[in-house]
Curated annotation (Swiss-Prot):
Subunit structure: Part of the 50S ribosomal subunit.
UniProt name for this protein: Large ribosomal subunit protein uL13c
Pfam families noted in UniProt: Ribosomal_L13
Native organism: Arabidopsis thaliana (Mouse-ear cress)
NCBIfam families: rplM_bact
InterPro entries the UniProt entry points to: Ribosomal_uL13, Ribosomal_uL13_bac-type, Ribosomal_uL13_CS, Ribosomal_uL13_sf
Presequence range in chain numbering: 1-50
Localization annotation: Plastid, Chloroplast
GO cellular component: chloroplast; chloroplast envelope; chloroplast stroma; mitochondrion; ribonucleoprotein complex; ribosome; thylakoid
GO biological process, alphabetically ordered: translation
GO molecular function: mRNA binding; structural constituent of ribosome
PANTHER family in the record: LARGE RIBOSOMAL SUBUNIT PROTEIN UL13M, RIBOSOMAL PROTEIN L13
Amino acid sequence: MAVLCSSSTVILSSSSVKSSGSERKSPFLGFSLTAISKPSVRVGIYANSKRGLQVKCEAEPTTTTSLVPANQRWMFDEEEANGPDIWNTTWYPKASDHVNTDKPWFVVDATDKILGRLASTIANHIRGKNLASYTPSVDMGAFVIVVNAEKVAVSGKKRNQKLYRRHSGRPGGMTVETFDQLQQRIPERIVEHAVRGMLPKGRLGRALFNHLKVYKGPDHPHEAQKPLDLPIRDKRIQLQK
């Protein structure tokens, strides 16, 4: 407690001893932040011969600095690392964060790859679930090109037992095809049907489905986008012969 005396004024300023700072850890991520606080209250006592004593409290602005440890700064930009409180700030992507012209393109060869495992990998990249900035309600994903769609494989007896149904909308307009029949007629539709079932149903799902490009044969017209090989982590995606 510091006391400053003058002829008619006494100012009391409460201050805490400057310490090295108190560490607090995020309950979700477990990282540590250092918070340093400064004195925040000033009490003034003004003496007047006619009116007696008058007490006034003045609040000083508090400055809290959150510092990210040096071994954790690689995860953040310079502005985020030196910002006030990055742990309690909700981040939401802006329009400039998901521009279609800035999104990557991937290409994958469907030869002898299991249909379901291939479709789930493609759907994850189209939705952007492989990104740290994944947001369920925003189109954050990449574009995926599938070539050799006629060579996709299925396990077990699905080639003859798996059925695809479509209806023309008229009475008796139901058409049923097996996997083998549809693969011989329109092989691209098999991959499109599998991936579309793994995307959201609604306006966002329809927009995400446009990121899928399926072609019969090894060629595709997207060389200008310079597509990269689709990273596949599933070791069982290839058909075991």
